[in-house]
């Protein structure tokens, strides 16, 4: 049975982006244990080094995403997919052989520099899919990275529980190698290289027809990613407070954190289709408002299961935001610079992961865990107002 090219590309890219997301986040629950195994015994040093090793990948990825986006526009998206998947597979496998914590941090830094799979995938799907299916394709694709990032800690914890610490890196590396092989065999791209002098950042920005809108969408992508990750540093402590028993705290915390990722996978393709029908500007406004409101009751839950239910609902609302932003970016960006612009929006997402983790920890330390939910809600609702005045009204008038 013949499968359309855009569908085949979508399936392979979804798997690759999911595994890439897992590869970046699976280390979160095992990091303190692995650092201890590598010879660090002081608790405060373990916490500090864990934070550096986790966050450095996202900061470096934010810097390199636009660079790889530019390379994708110049040399094609498929070569970037192959480079990123093979490079990350090697870096993650080497982490399993790290002799000390400093080599581990250096390899996490290298992993951040090598990434670019998400940028190339998003650009490939945006430029190789027809307009009728673009919203659905980008909606489906957007679930991969965020689901991989959110489910990664649970997957890492389960592998560690079953096989031990080092096999987490070997199994994740093997999955990325599978992504490399499937990309090599199945992904096809019709790419015509333009024999023009490469554009610098100022020239690219000059070519963007909707500068104001591009800024709003990038900031919104940063805020929604930040909102998902503010709970990351406090989830285990909060679940412990809510639980009557101390059994399986790590697993329950992982499930509560990952519930939004599961909901995202379910909701995003359908909300991507909805944005094609009623307009992306309407979906983005409703989703932001709903997400902002759903954060408030999370501060008042009485059990981990109530928290899990609200996190699932949050994932459904935020599932409408990623595909909508990608669809709008594609709509307002010329094909020749799509990779660069997607590189900037994906960088905003990586910064959101890092910023959310830092903000959640700082707010919880200074004001208490409940205030993490109030601050996150306020940020989403303020962003919603900004989108209403700068995006929604503009598109509605047109």
How should each PLM-predicted stretch be described?
Residues 1-6, 188-218:
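Juxtamembrane intracellular "pre-TM" segments in multi-pass secondary transporters
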Residues 30-47, 234-251:
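Short amphipathic helix-loop junctions that connect adjacent transmembrane helices
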Residues 52-68, 258-269:
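Central cavity-lining transmembrane alpha-helices of secondary-active solute carriers
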Residues 62-99, 275-281:
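Conserved MFS/SLC helix-loop-helix module at the cytosolic interface between two early adjacent transmembrane helices
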Residues 79-94, 173, 282-297, 377:
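Structural signature of the two symmetry-related core transmembrane helices
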Residues 91, 102-110, 294, 305-313:
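Paired small-residue
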Residues 107-145, 327-328:
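Cytoplasmic helix-loop-helix junction between adjacent transmembrane helices
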Residues 168-184, 372-389:
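Symmetry-related core transmembrane helices of the 12-TM Major Facilitator Superfamily/SLC fold
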């Amino acid at each position: 049975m013949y499968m359309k090219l855009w569908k085949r590309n979508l399936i392979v890219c979804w798997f690759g982006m999911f595994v890439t997301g897992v590869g970046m986040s699976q280390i979160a629950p095992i990091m303190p244990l692995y650092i201890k195994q590598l010879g660090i015994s002081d608790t405060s040093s373990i916490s500090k080094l864990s934070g550096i090793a986790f966050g450095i990948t996202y900061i470096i990825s934010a810097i390199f995403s636009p660079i790889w986006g530019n390379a994708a526009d110049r040399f094609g998206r498929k070569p970037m997919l192959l480079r990123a998947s093979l490079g990350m597979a090697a870096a993650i496998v080497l982490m399993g052989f790290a002799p000390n914590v400093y080599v581990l941090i250096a390899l996490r830094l290298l992993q951040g520099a090598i990434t670019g799979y998400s940028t190339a995938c998003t650009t490939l799907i945006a430029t190789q899919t027809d307009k009728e299916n673009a919203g659905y394709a980008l909606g489906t694709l957007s679930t991969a990275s965020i689901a991989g990032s959110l489910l990664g800690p649970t997957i890492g914890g389960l592998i560690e529980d079953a096989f031990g610490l080092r096999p987490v890196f070997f199994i994740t590396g093997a999955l990325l190698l599978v992504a490399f092989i499937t990309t090599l065999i199945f992904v096809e791209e019709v790419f015509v290289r333009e024999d023009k002098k490469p554009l610098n950042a100022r020239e690219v920005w000059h070519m963007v027809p909707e500068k104001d809108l591009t800024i709003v969408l990038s900031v919104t992508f940063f805020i929604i990613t930040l909102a998902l990750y503010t709970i990351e540093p406090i989830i285990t402590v909060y679940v412990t407070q809510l639980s009557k028993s101390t059994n399986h705290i790590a697993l329950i915390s992982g499930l509560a954190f990952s519930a939004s990722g599961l909901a995202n996978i379910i909701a995003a393709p359908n909300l991507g289709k909805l944005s094609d029908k009623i307009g992306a500007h309407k979906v983005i406004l409703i989703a932001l408002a709903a997400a902002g409101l759903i954060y408030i009751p999370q501060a008042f839950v009485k059990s981990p299961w109530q928290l899990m239910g609200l996190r699932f609902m949050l994932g459904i609302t935020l599932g409408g935001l990623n595909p909508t932003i990608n669809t709008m970016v594609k709509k307002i960006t010329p094909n020749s610079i799509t990779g660069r612009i997607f590189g900037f929006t994906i960088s905003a997402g990586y910064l959101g992961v890092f910023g959310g983790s830092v903000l959640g920890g700082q707010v919880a330390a200074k004001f208490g865990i409940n205030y993490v939910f109030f601050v996150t809600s306020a940020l989403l609702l303020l962003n919603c107002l900004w989108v209403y005045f700068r995006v929604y009204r503009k598109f509605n008038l047109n």
